[in-house]
Regions:
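N-terminal beta-propeller domains
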Residues: 1-96, 134-186, 239-314, 318, ...
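Beta-sheet repeat architectures centered on beta-propellers
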Residues: 2-91, 308, 373, 377-513, ...
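Structural signature of eukaryotic scaffold interfaces centered on beta-propeller domains
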Residues: 62-73, 110-119, 247-261, 305-316, ...
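Short beta-strand elements that form the blades of beta-propeller/WD-repeat-like
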Residues: 76-81, 123-126, 264-267, 311-323, ...
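Beta-strand-rich solenoidal segments
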Residues: 87-170, 213, 229, 422-423, ...
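Autoprocessing Asn-cyclization modules and mimics
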Residues: 95-100, 145-241, 389-399, 477-594, ...
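Catalytic or ion-translocation cores adjacent to nucleophile or general acid/base/metal-coordination motifs
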Residues: 335-372
């Protein structure tokens, strides 16, 4: 005897769930989750929407790392760093500064290890193997890369060398001393170490002896260098109190950089990995610790049983410090200051961060754990009176694959949702975007995955205010091309790498001969024959004519029969302009590729671009047809299960007999049950007046299925690149009552 029951899926706010949760029917996430949630945006109301497509902006010179430049709401720019090069674009894809190579010291391998901090018109770029750089906007449309240099004190100067305001550190063993040929200021002094301490790389670097500075001008041997003494060093020694530049080509450079509490913070110097350095207040190039006054520079190392490499800073209410071995923060005094006297670094959690920079998202700092398999949020807890690092990806860890970049979108002009995007770079799903939707105050959190065309990969991602921009690695016309693309604000753009066509005018058609009248006209100058159902206008009259028959006169001349008589007698050689046609011009970047075409609410199908950069549509269309690449959204429910008084349905054959899908503004939908014999059903609103566009469906649509399955699911997808929103569904399940009793 068969029985049936109904269950309602009111929302999908938990997103895609780990396959290992397939039998966890007891959890709230199971009820509101999905077996697959691919290429959908989770909505604040609980439904899902086909993810927005992208618009093609520009082609990049190679593999690139995008970084945002945001000066204000109106002044933003996309900075693309590639191998020893920088290019800058506005949000429309227009180049502002191109092929900048001066001072671009990063390599392709280092791109996603670079860290950034912006202050006004300047972005500081840090890497442990490279001297720090500054990207400076010198005018509204001009960007350049400059060397980062510590400040100097020209009141102390000898031989053209000024005293430096940089930090110093004793790297050499404490048993090594130095002696001087003379301790007074002057050039050509000899400094001798008691053991090997120098290489030729030390030339043109500062040294500090007894707290007084000198400048190395020559190298003689591992124990002997020539220096210029800038300040009297007290005696000729030997001196055990001597230091080198903290930051140099010898000892490496900082990899963490941030602005906090009106100071520039540097950290994680390669040979001093636990270092935390802060400039003087409001003097961002002055790292002179001086006497330790409240406004002077800060120089310390994070202490612990292990040396923790400082990888990232994040300036929020506190300065958060992320290392490879744990998470720390620098508390503020009651007067909100951080000074050399009160500075402290407090360890909070022990997980460690990858080289991917953290970002603030939904009141917490999201970061990729060092193992690359977990996303955690570093958030303050009043109950614990400290920070905790909660794993937010635990229900969907299969979607996390060593992310190399994070971007946060805090809503846009049309939707309130905020999303965090994690660009995967592992071996399982490289080039995909794990997307996290969270509303902390409502205890809503869910994951999904975004992909693009098969064999194409997302390469870099940033947000600029409400804009989301990506670099995509695409295979186009047999070559690898890196494209700059911008996600749309809504699902109205349903294609990736979208551009619009222009109607091919088929040469330079002109009216052939004066005095023509009636419902036909002879036109010369066609490079391609006109086709029935194409439309055109003639100069001097706005009337649009539809071609109903075509007669070739030989060469480029054709006589066209029209749907109406000529409104006026056209002049000889009057220009003819096609207004609707089959042949359309496209950007050369699509050459020999198969593209999908969408016009308004109608999907026109897939077409292959010719070697001359044209497509031939099956219906005549005006200029402005959207072309691009389709992507497939998939929403599959968790196995429909139920706990009955007689026992659970888990593992028993059952059939989804009916599903009612709540749709909103949907133009295309395919639906099937999990059974192998189930067929895709299509809903598309086709009740429209000839010549008009399709009408989106906002309604509850009912579907019926056959076939039994032990883990039945409902899968929603699309064949055509058109808008789709699913708010929820009601499912009816039929099962054998006798099996429940036997079970």
């Amino acid at each position: 005897m068969a029985r049936s029951l109904k269950t309602v899926i009111t929302n999908f706010s938990a997103g895609e769930l780990n396959p290992l949760l397939a039998t966890r029917t007891d959890t709230p996430a199971y009820i509101n989750g999905a077996k697959q949630c691919r290429n959908f945006s989770l909505l604040a109301e609980g439904g899902v929407m086909r993810r927005p497509g992208t618009t093609y902006l520009a082609s990049l010179p190679g593999e690139s790392r995008l970084i945002p430049f945001v000066f204000s709401d109106d002044e933003i720019a996309i900075i693309a760093l590639s191998n020893n090069r920088m290019d800058v674009y506005n949000i429309s894809g227009t180049a502002l500064s191109s092929n900048v190579t001066t001072n671009c010291n990063w390599t392709t391998a280092q791109l996603f290890e670079l860290n950034f901090a912006q202050f006004g018109d300047t972005i500081f770029v840090a890497h442990r193997d490279n001297p720090t750089r500054k990207i400076f906007r010198s005018s509204a449309t001009t960007f350049e890369v400059q060397e980062f240099e510590f400040g100097t004190d020209d009141s102390v100067s000898v031989g053209g060398v000024d005293k430096s305001q940089q930090p110093f550190f004793k790297y050499a063993a404490g048993t090594i001393s130095v002696s001087l040929s003379a301790n007074t200021t002057g050039t050509g002094r000899t400094l001798t170490a008691s053991a090997n301490a120098f290489t030729s790389d030390y030339v043109n670097q500062y040294i500090e002896v007894n707290g007084k500075q000198g400048f190395i001008t020559g190298y003689t041997s591992p124990t002997v260098v020539t220096i210029t003494i800038l300040e009297d060093m007290g005696s000729t020694g030997p001196h055990f109190d001597w230091k080198e530049q903290t930051i140099s080509s010898v000892n490496g450079f900082p990899q963490a950089v941030s602005f906090h509490n009106n100071r520039l913070w540097l950290g994680g110097v390669k040979n001093r990995p636990a270092s935390v350095l802060a400039s003087r207040i409001s003097e961002y190039f002055n790292f002179d610790v001086g006497s330790g006054a409240a406004d002077e520079a800060i120089d310390l190392d994070i202490s612990g049983s292990e040396v923790n490499e400082v990888r990232h800073f994040l300036s929020v209410k506190d300065l958060q410090i992320f290392t490879d071995g744990g998470e720390y923060y620098v508390p503020r005094a009651t007067d909100n200051t951080i000074t050399p006297a009160n500075v402290a670094v407090l360890r909070q959690t022990p997980y460690g961060i990858s080289r991917t920079a953290p970002l603030l998202f939904d009141q917490a700092s999201g970061f990729v754990q060092k193992n690359g398999k977990s996303i955690r949020e570093f958030v303050y807890s009043d109950i614990e009176d400290g920070y905790k690092s909660t794993a937010v990806s635990i229900l969907a860890e299969h979607l996390i694959d060593s992310p190399k970049q994070i971007a946060v979108l805090k809503g846009n002009a049309t939707r309130p949702e905020q999303y965090a995007f994690f660009l995967n770079n592992g071996t399982t799903s490289p080039g995909t975007l794990a997307i996290f939707h969270s509303v902390r105050d409502e205890k809503i959190a869910g994951w999904g995955l975004w992909t693009t065309r098969t064999n194409d990969l997302f390469q870099s991602i940033i947000s600029l205010n409400e804009h989301l921009v990506v670099c995509v690695k695409r295979q186009l016309n047999g070559s690898t091309v890196y494209t700059l693309e911008k996600f749309a604000d809504t699902d109205s753009i349903t294609l990736d790498m979208k551009l619009t066509t222009t109607l091919n005018q088929k040469g330079t058609p002109l009216v052939q001969g004066a005095g023509q009248s009636g419902a036909s006209v002879t036109i010369d100058g066609f490079s391609t024959a006109p086709v029935i159902n194409e439309s055109f206008t003639i100069a001097g009259n706005a009337t649009e004519y539809l071609i109903q028959a075509v007669t070739s006169n030989g060469g480029t001349s054709f006589t066209l029969n029209l749907d109406k008589s000529l409104a006026a007698t056209p002049a000889d050689n009057a220009a003819v302009t096609l207004t609707k046609g089959f042949l359309h011009n496209v950007n050369t970047i699509y050459r020999n590729e198969q593209v999908n075409c969408v016009d308004g609410n109608s999907s026109l199908g897939a077409f292959t671009v010719s070697g001359t950069d044209t497509i031939t549509l099956t219906t005549p269309r005006a200029t402005g047809v959207h072309i691009g690449f389709n992507f497939i959204p998939i929403l599959e429910t968790m196995p429909i299960d139920k706990e009955l008084a007689e026992g659970p349905l888990t593992g028993l054959p059952r059939r989804i007999s009916r599903a009612i899908i709540d749709l909103n503004s949907t133009l295309d939908l395919t639906i099937k049950a999990a059974d192998k014999t189930a067929k895709s059903l299509v809903v598309q609103q086709v009740t429209f007046t000839g010549g008009s566009d399709l009408n989106p469906v906002t309604a509850k649509k009912e579907f019926f299925f056959l076939g039994y399955d032990k883990s039945p699911t409902v899968t929603l997808s699309q064949d055509d690149p058109l808008p789709m929103k699913v708010l929820g569904m009601s499912v009816e399940v039929v099962f054998a009552w006798v099996l429940i009793q036997l079970h």
